[in-house]
Amino acid sequence: MELLAPNLRVVFCGINPGLSSAHQGYPFANGSNRFWKVIHQAGFTESQLAPEQWQQLKDNGCGITALVARPTVAASELSRDELRSGGEALQEKILRYQPRALAILGKQAFTTAFGVKNAPWGKQTLTLGETEVWVLPNPSGLNRATLEQLTASYRELFLALQ
């Protein structure tokens, strides 16, 4: 469940697939996950895509990947070593494809995977080659952020890429 190509505007990087996504074969497939609604409301897609339409993200200049490929019920089941290893692999992919931005969906996952302390939300000072790195709230239904808060965070990235 990875969609990478040269010249993308943004690559959205989830933490890892949930069991629903692993079973269905689509990223962010759990009905409680707000990813598809949020990226549409933020402006990244003209219409709201369903999880099974995930490959159409590329038509909108967007890619998708995950820090860790192993599916779990909750991201908290991942070890620090898995996240660090995933961060190293992610950096290699981003350096190869060089999208304009990498959006990591989750602050704790970012700080662990990249060895960064006290990262703010939004644009980071860290870049990967020419790629800007952003940290956005995870759209999981387990995240307490409201739909409006999520959309505002993702919209900030969308507007920065205009």
UniProtKB/Swiss-Prot annotation:
Key words, A-Z: Cytoplasm, DNA damage, DNA excision, DNA repair, DNA-binding, Hydrolase
Pfam families from the UniProt entry: UDG
SUPFAM superfamilies to which the protein is assigned, alphabetical: Uracil-DNA glycosylase-like (SSF52141)
Transmembrane segments: none
Biological processes, Gene Ontology terms: base-excision repair, AP site formation
EC number(s) on file: 3.2.2.28
Reactions this protein catalyses: Specifically hydrolyzes mismatched double-stranded DNA and polynucleotides, releasing free uracil
Any GO molecular function: DNA binding
Cellular location(s): Cytoplasm
GO CC annotation terms, alphabetical: cytoplasm
Keyword Cell inner membrane in annotation: no
Quaternary structure (record): Binds DNA as a monomer.
Family: Belongs to the uracil-DNA glycosylase (UDG) superfamily. TDG/mug family.
Function: Excises ethenocytosine and uracil, which can arise by alkylation or deamination of cytosine, respectively, from the corresponding mispairs with guanine in ds-DNA. It is capable of hydrolyzing the carbon-nitrogen bond between the sugar-phosphate backbone of the DNA and the mispaired base. The complementary strand guanine functions in substrate recognition. Required for DNA damage lesion repair in stationary-phase cells.
Protein name, as recorded: G/U mismatch-specific DNA glycosylase
